[in-house]
Amino acid sequence: MKKRASDKVVPPSWEQMGSWVALVETGSVSAAALRLGISQAGVSQHVRQLEESLGASLLDRTTRPAHPTAAGQRLYEQARDLLSRASHMTETVRALSRSKRSLLRLGCVDSFAATIGPQMVRGLAGRVQRLRLVSGINPGLAEQFDNHQLDVLITTDDPKPAAGRAYLALFSEQFLLAVPSDFQLPPLASLHQLSGLRPFMHYSTRSKMGALVDAYLARHDPDIEQVFEFDATDPLLSLVREDLGIALTTPLCLWQSRYHAMHLKCVPLTALRHQGRAYPPLQRTFYMVYRPDELGPLAQDIAAMVRVAVRELQRQWVSVLKIPADLISVNEDR
């Protein structure tokens, strides 16, 4: 068949080339079909399609059995080489995906490391030879990621688009009010009124958590006095437990310090009233930041591990701490 220069050239499919190589090597349509696990009609159809698409006769049908023509022999040699390289490519890619990464450096905020960290270590044990888990506050961790000292960053900072990096939203948690277990909460109370009964314990504004809480209070209760400030959850909640103050915190932080949290009373913000209306919810979202070219498919595996771990912890939070399940929401986006 004579082709015009304007005709679009469609390369042979892998199946067609596989049938041709099998036919040449076995010497018959029936043997080729047996090797490939398809029908004899399928092999014959592939050969006809090859001849039509290439515009060349591949078999000399004047002989018995038929033999490849010069064009057919050239196609056989090149098709065999292509199929061999494709098979090698598949195996090397699969081997790479199965192989262990030599070192994974994962940075995360303290509350994540203390609660989700153990599940991450177990889940990654079969995927990496060495795991370095670095915890701290968002600004320091972000700097380490920017300097390529971390491969993965779990952060509550809002994503900032940048070349060569990607983000996955993992889960969100809403803040709630932690008060001493025997504290009698006045009906329809505001945070400002409660801070007059017990001092308000603040997280350090060096952390994203402290900045979120301070911004929230500035919008709704700017007159709350700031006397106590903490970098860590443990000392903050220990003082609340001892009836020395109240604080806004999250389920993850409560679980991190559950020794203290089990002796606290936790109230959703929406149960309080500000100027006669329920307080709006305050939440923080955890994101995974990574470099796709470096992490590859492991990124989705890590995200899946986190989501599974959060769902499991959510059941425990509800059972042990008696906090509503809907304060935690897992982001299922891929």
List each language-model region with its residue ranges.
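Central regulatory/effector-binding core of bacterial HTH transcription factors
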Residues: 101-161
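Secondary-structure junction motif
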Residues: 185, 199-220, 251, 296-306, ...
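Beta-alpha-beta core module
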Residues: 162-168, 173, 235-292
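Alpha-helical linker/hinge and terminal dimerization helices associated
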Residues: 53-54, 75-97
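A short LG(V/I)-centered, amphipathic sequence patch enriched
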Residues: 51-70
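Short helix-boundary/capping micro-motifs
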Residues: 21-37
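Short beta-strand-to-loop elements that line the ligand-binding cleft
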Residues: 129-137, 156, 203, 223-235
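Flexible hinge/capping segments at coil-to-helix
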Residues: 164-201
